[in-house]
């Protein structure tokens, strides 16, 4: 009994320490985001999204105002809710993005914890908290930050086989941005891995089918209203998947913008925004992660043992990252800086799990003793300090760029967007 009491006391102390560490990381993430919060005046996309949220808050509940948005309406309703609660202003318009960024820090901790352990979760949360692009998207009025928080949460519920909630969250993500459709193969592969790990033969097939049906009620609760709005209420009368097919087939942009080689250089630059370090670090950790996973697969195969579920899912995450890179380089009609952001959480998870794995691995002969672990620990600490220093410098640079950006007045904005609006002076603050 005394031993059991000591065990529970130790667990409570560990949990309390984790709470303190995670709270500190959340505070750090908030400080990074507040340092550049709403520094740039709302313009173009962010101003336009806010205008639609304002229209809803002022009584256009079905959002029938003439508009040119290529996004589903759910994010605009979230902005409208904040406007109703806190008043209509530019700073409130940015608040949903800030909340999404803070949610993402907590959610990626739970993903890292459940895929590896608490150390990997805390490391992932720290890296996501200081990620320059995550910080930037959290401090502007764009959709991506909240969208990725919901997407990460959907994968966490999938990991725990809470399929109704997974379906609901996929529906919410689709209600904000069609990018979630590119995650379709990822969801299916993760589902197959989960069910085939717990079942075999015909039972696995029935379990997969049953799981998909469990997702459907939650998904359609959100999807059907969005579909009805898109087809019958909005002035654009959006056709089903119109913008997605345009993204792939080029109906709206028949020219493939740039070359794949040009996009590769843009991708390298974008990867530098993951944690502020050079893309060489990100790709290096990614390749090392794949090598470690392949080593585990070979070892378990030679021993005729089943690979652990967490390793299967981690390998799946890496495959999806490669698939998304392929879409950006060879399929998408155009490439913008933040298009790579949807894979940032998975790159951060991969890097965090790999660094923690290096402290425990037995594959490398020079890491079989305490001395090897100390060396790896020192290298890991240097990497984290470098990441923090680089991320801080990059966020400061972003802040300077935002402070020095030319202010776009009401008349300039109206001049650009007025042809697409019925009432040109009702959409901006």
Locate each region found by the language model.
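Short helix- or helix-capping micro-motifs
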Residues: 26-32, 124-129, 156, 170, ...
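Short periplasmic/luminal acceptor-recognition loop of GT-C membrane glycosyltransferases, typified by
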Residues: 166, 407, 418-429
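Specific aromatic-rich, kink-prone transmembrane helix
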Residues: 107-110, 126-127, 136, 146-165, ...
């Amino acid at each position: 009994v005394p031993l059991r009491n000591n065990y529970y006391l130790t667990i409570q102390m560990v949990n309390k320490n984790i709470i303190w560490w995670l709270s500190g990381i959340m505070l750090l993430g908030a400080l990074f985001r507040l340092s550049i919060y709403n520094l740039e005046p709302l313009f173009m996309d962010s101003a336009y999204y806010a205008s639609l949220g304002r229209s809803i808050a002022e009584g256009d509940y079905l959002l029938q105002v003439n508009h040119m948005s290529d996004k589903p309406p759910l994010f605009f309703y979230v902005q409208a809710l904040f406007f109703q609660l806190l008043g209509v202003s530019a700073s409130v318009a940015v608040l949903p993005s800030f909340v999404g960024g803070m949610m993402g820090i907590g959610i990626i901790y739970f993903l890292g914890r459940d895929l590896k352990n608490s150390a990997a979760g805390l490391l992932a949360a720290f890296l996501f908290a200081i990620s320059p692009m995550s910080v930037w998207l959290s401090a502007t009025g764009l959709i991506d930050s909240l969208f990725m928080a919901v997407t990460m949460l959907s994968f966490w519920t999938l990991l725990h086989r809470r399929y109704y909630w997974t379906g609901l969250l996929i529906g919410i993500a689709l209600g904000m941005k069609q990018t979630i459709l590119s995650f379709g193969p990822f969801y299916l592969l993760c589902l197959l891995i989960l069910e085939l790990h717990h079942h075999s033969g015909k039972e696995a097939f029935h379990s997969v089918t049953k799981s998909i049906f469990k997702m459907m009620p939650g998904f359609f609760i959100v999807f059907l209203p969005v579909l009805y709005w898109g087809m019958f209420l909005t002035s654009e009368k959006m056709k089903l998947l119109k913008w997605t097919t345009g993204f792939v087939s080029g109906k709206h942009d028949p020219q493939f913008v740039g070359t794949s080689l040009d996009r590769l250089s843009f991708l390298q630059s974008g990867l530098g925004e993951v944690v502020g370090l050079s893309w060489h670090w990100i790709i290096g950790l990614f390749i090392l992660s794949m090598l470690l996973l392949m080593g585990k697969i070979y070892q378990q195969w030679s021993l005729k043992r089943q690979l652990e579920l967490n390793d299967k899912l981690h390998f799946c995450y890496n495959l999806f990252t490669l698939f998304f890179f392929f879409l950006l380089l060879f399929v998408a009609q155009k490439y913008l800086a933040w298009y790579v952001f949807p894979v940032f959480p998975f790159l951060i998870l991969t890097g965090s799990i790999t660094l923690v794995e290096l402290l425990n691995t037995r594959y490398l002969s020079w890491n079989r003793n305490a001395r090897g672990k100390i060396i790896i620990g020192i290298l890991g600490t240097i990497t984290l300090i470098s990441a923090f220093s680089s991320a801080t410098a990059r966020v400061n640079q972003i802040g300077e760029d935002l402070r020095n950006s030319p202010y776009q007045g009401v008349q300039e904005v109206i001049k650009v967007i007025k042809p697409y609006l019925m009432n040109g002076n009702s959409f901006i603050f």
